[in-house]
Amino acid sequence: MNQKLVPVNTAGCYIPGGRYAHIASAVMSVTTAKVAGVKNIIACSPPKEGVGAHPTIVYTADLCGADVILNLGGVPAIAAMTNGLFNNPPADIIVGPGNQFVAEAKRILFGKVGIDLFAGPTEIGIIADAKADPEIVAVDLLSLIHI
C-alpha cells in the first residue's frame, strides 16, 4: 500500500478578521498550502470599517506566501474563491474557520469545491487550582487569543 500526494492548483484561505485579527488562521492556512506546493493561494479577509482588511492579516498572509489577498469576508468571500472571481482561478479547496454563515456556505458548496471542515468558534477552558504556576496558566489563557 502506498500514498501519492498531489497538490491542488488553487487553495482559497478564509481568514476571519471581523472583531479580531485571526493571524494564526493566516499562518495555518496559507503556510500549509505553500508547503504542500499549491500553485495559487488566494486569501480573503473581511474589511474593518474605514481601514480595509486588518493590516496584520494582510502582512501575515503576504509573508506566508499568499499570491492574492482579497478584502472580502463572509459568504461573498467563499463564493468569490469558489467561482474564481476577480480574474482569479477557481479554488479547488476552501480552508479556514468562520462564523455560522461561512460554515453554511462551505457546507452548501462541498462537492463543487473541497473543504477542510466546518469550523466553529474557538473555545478554551483552563482548570487550575491554588498550586498552579500563574505564569503557565497565563500562557495557557493566551494560547488562542486573537488580537
Predicted regions and their residues:
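Conserved NAD(P)+-binding/catalytic subdomain of aldehyde/semialdehyde dehydrogenases
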Residues: 63-140
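Conserved small/polar residues in nucleotide/adenosyl-binding loops
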Residues: 145-147
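Conserved small-residue-rich beta-alpha loop and adjacent elements
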Residues: 1-59
